């Protein structure tokens, strides 16, 4: 699931991302920069992940479906789901889950 930050209204300087029952205890947190020569290659694993785009634009592929993402977008990745991220320029993002 991809939640477009641009579609969420800001109230009192906050945006509420509705993630439903996708709540997880966080045991992984990493800030990454992806570039054309340093793509985030396809992988899958048994843990749910959340990606939050800080700066730049990229293409996220989840189970073969490609979606353009940019600043303030939140990507929810279910366990055992193929996922990757590529950027034509660069993108700074956080991975946690």
Feature annotation, model-predicted:
Residues 1-33, 40-42:
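A short, N-terminal "cap"/entry segment at the start of jelly-roll beta-barrel domains
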Residues 21, 38-45, 62, 86-87:
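Short histidine-centered beta-strand/loop micro-motifs
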Residues 27, 61-65, 88:
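Short strand-coil-strand connectors
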Residues 41, 50, 65-68:
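Short, surface-exposed secondary-structure edge patches
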Residues 44-60:
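Short, conserved beta-strand element in jelly-roll/cupin
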Residues 54-55, 71, 89:
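A cytosolic small-molecule/anion-sensing beta-strand core signal
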Residues 64-79:
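Short acidic-glycine-tyrosine-enriched beta hairpin
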Residues 79-97:
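Ligand-binding loop in jelly-roll beta-barrel domains
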